[in-house]
Regions:
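Boundary at the C-terminal end of the N-terminal hydrophobic targeting segment
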Residues: 21-24
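Bacterial N-terminal signal peptides that target proteins for export
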Residues: 1-9
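Active-site microenvironments of metalloenzymes and redox enzymes
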Residues: 36-46, 57-154
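C-terminal, low-complexity/hydrophilic appendages and adjacent surface loops
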Residues: 47-52
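Bacterial N-terminal signal peptides
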Residues: 8-16
Length: 154
């Protein structure tokens, strides 16, 4: 799957590992019951090779955003962090954010975690982002969590 689409879709289904504190900084979440499912696909010339070879994967219970992160929510973040809002077209402030990078998405997760008094999940170690799955803050879903949710297996 194209990395840009993966970032967009994962942000759309932003996973959350905490409980609500403030409606302004806390999108509605749902709990997904974990299970085993068949992930990936068989050889297909239209599918990237890293998505091939279907195999069974087990995901644990996780939480995920019920709705997309909106333009309005992203504006709140960029304004608070004094960042430039992306030059994008949208229909309304309730439209989902798009055309952002994976780094933008994890920085948003850390910002949202801090706003809610939670431990940020992502940190930079040796110039690379590392995910601390033991932290109680917001994070993006893993590839398996995303695929499980995207297939409607929740």
């Amino acid at each position: 799957m194209n990395k840009n689409y993966y970032v967009i879709f994962t942000l759309i289904f932003l996973s959350f590992l905490s409980f609500k504190t403030s409606a302004q900084y806390n999108p509605e979440i749902v709990t997904v019951k974990g299970s085993t499912f068949n992930m990936g696909t068989e050889k297909n010339p239209y599918i990237e090779t890293d998505e091939q070879l279907a195999h069974d994967v087990t995901v644990n219970d996780f939480e995920i955003g019920k709705f997309e992160i909106t333009i309005s929510e992203w504006e709140l973040y960029t304004r608070d962090q004094k960042l430039k809002f992306p030059n994008i077209r949208y229909i309304s402030k309730q439209s989902p954010i798009h055309s952002i990078s994976w780094v933008d998405a994890v920085n948003y997760c850390n910002w949202l975690s801090k706003k809610n008094g939670l431990k940020p999940v992502y940190k930079i170690v040796n110039s690379q982002y590392v995910c601390d799955f033991n932290a109680n803050g917001y994070r993006l879903p893993t590839e398996a969590e995303w695929e499980y949710a995207a297939y409607g297996l929740i």
